[in-house]
Curated annotation (Swiss-Prot):
Role description: Transcriptional factor involved in regulation of membrane lipid biosynthesis by repressing genes involved in fatty acid and phospholipid metabolism.
GO terms of molecular function: DNA binding; DNA-binding transcription factor activity
Organism: Bacillus pumilus (strain SAFR-032)
UniProt name for this protein: Transcription factor FapR
Similarity comment text for this entry: Belongs to the FapR family.
Keywords on record: DNA-binding, Fatty acid biosynthesis, Fatty acid metabolism, Lipid biosynthesis, Lipid metabolism, Repressor, Transcription, Transcription regulation
Gene Ontology biological process terms from the UniProt entry: fatty acid biosynthetic process; negative regulation of DNA-templated transcription; negative regulation of fatty acid biosynthetic process
Length: 188
């Protein structure tokens, strides 16, 4: 039995609500309509496309996990975190990140991405950078994507310090590396 538009849209909302990662193609098959019809229904109902739904779910999950700073204070887009273990963020280098005369990224943006990731990976309400040993290994240009990966290297429970190693890449090439000694309030 074919559903009318109102019924289909109601079921579409329920389906996406319960299964946010369902594709338009899967929805079209489920409801026996074209992909374009599903897209028009989503548009009418103000339901974002799959990519935006995935991003929203990921942000909500990360927001619940990251304790040391609000997600909007992480420089770049945080895509993964396992507290006191590892984290990953992506920074798309845009016009506002570069020098106007040569389109080379300003170093403080790369440092800020790495430092905020080092803070975010700490499983504590308070995490501060006590010391950083950093190295820029190549210039980054406008339009490049910097993937920053943080890994907790060690804990000194007595001193309340955690060492976080951060490497930032454009493709396979390391463009920045740093060891961040992080102060934390809890001795975990």
């Amino acid at each position: 039995m074919k559903l009318n538009k109102k019924e289909r849209q109601k079921l579409l909302q329920q389906t996406i609500s319960s299964t946010p990662f369902i594709t338009d193609e899967e929805l079209a098959t489920k409801f026996g309509v074209s992909i374009q019809t599903v897209r028009l229904d989503r548009l009418e109902l103000s339901i974002p496309e799959l990519r935006e739904r995935i991003k929203h779910v990921a942000e909500k999950t990360l927001e619940d996990e990251v304790k040391s700073l609000p997600l909007d204070e992480v420089i770049g887009e945080m895509i993964d975190v396992e507290l006191d273990d590892q984290a990953i963020s992506i920074l798309e280098v845009r016009k506002e990140h570069v020098f106007s005369r040569n389109q080379i990224a300003r170093g403080h943006h790369l440092f800020a991405q790495a430092n905020s990731l080092a803070v975010a990976v700490i499983d504590d309400e308070l995490a501060l950078t006590a010391k950083a040993n950093i190295k820029f290994t190549r210039q980054v240009k406008q339009g490049e994507r910097v993937v920053s990966k943080a890994k907790v290297a060690s804990h000194d429970k007595e001193k309340g310090r955690t060492v976080v190693e951060v490497n930032s890449y454009v493709g396979e090439e390391v463009v920045f590396s740093g060891d961040f000694v992080m102060y934390r309030s809890k001795q975990k």
